[in-house]
Amino acid sequence: MLTFILCIAALVVGYIFYGKRVDKIFGSDDRETPAITLNDGVDFVPMKGWKIFLVQLLNIAGLGPIFGALNGALFGPVVYLWIVFGTIFAGGVHDYMCGMLSMRHKGASISEITGTYLGKVMLQVMRVFSVILLVMVGVVFSKGPAGLLALLTPEKLDATFWLWVIIIYYFIATFVPIDKVIGKIYPIFGICLIIMAVGVAGVLLFSHEYQMPELWNNFYNQHPQNIHIWPFMFVTVACGAISGFHATQSPMMARCCTSEKQGHKVFYGAMVAEGIIAMVWAAAGVSFYENTQALLEA
């Protein structure tokens, strides 16, 4: 339990101090943001800071810090170190820079920013790569929730039914102004994601039924199939440490920020929140089951 508490504390301290340091180095100021100067009522729409944070959290998280962290837990408590240090020094910086660079470049996407600095060839490469990446992520973030919803609803509402519902929702959310659907629904889902993590953490901390193993007693690879920590643990836990996919999402909220001063809370803060969620689920993975073999079989 002490390891878990120290890791959560480290993430919070990292947000407060290292996140502020990153913000200071970047030099956020009081200049007008694209949400103000390019306000079109569609993509560039000023939104409240707390809404932007929750939308950003849901955009970058989804099921990633749950599935990824649980798979990462197969390696044992050593996964905690990757989540903590990856979030503070890699993921948080990556997401912050992507969001702030977009804000400084009139809300440009990651591919357009790449083209600005690396030329037209890399612009086209990043456009193709981004489309492929988004299709792959879209498939995962469609099939996963559809399967879960099918388990929670009557048998006639199978995974195929929910998959179509999700796809239709995607199209609606994409074609209407960002504050009409995404800005209204995503904050609710973001709160649900946080509440779920708090609930699981509460069980871990206050239930005597589960024992959280300490890192110092389990500082070795516990994967039941002897899969190497390097590089597999680091690519297994992406959402929850660092994920390049986030670069495609941060510009969406960069177009809604009303001040560059929101960058620390929205971009770095959402990544730290995702790291905390990943920590909770990784701890659940190593605690709820007798060993990593039982977790794998589950």
Spell out what each predicted region is.
Residues 10-66, 262:
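Membrane-interface "cap" regions at the ends of multi-pass membrane proteins
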Residues 10-11, 15, 90-106, 110-175, ...:
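Helix-loop-helix module between adjacent transmembrane segments
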Residues 47-105, 116-117, 267-291:
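Membrane-interface helix-loop-helix modules in multi-pass membrane proteins
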Residues 117-120, 124-125, 188-203, 271-276, ...:
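Small-residue-rich segments of transmembrane alpha-helices in multi-pass membrane proteins
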Residues 138-142, 146-164, 174, 194-221, ...:
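Hydrophobic alpha-helical segments and their helix-loop junctions in multi-pass secondary transporters
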Residues 187-190, 196-247:
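Helix-loop-helix junctions that connect adjacent transmembrane segments
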Residues 188-192, 249-282:
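Junctions where cytoplasmic loops transition into the N-terminal start of transmembrane alpha-helices
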Residues 205-214, 261, 272-298:
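Extracellular/periplasmic helix-exit of transmembrane alpha-helices
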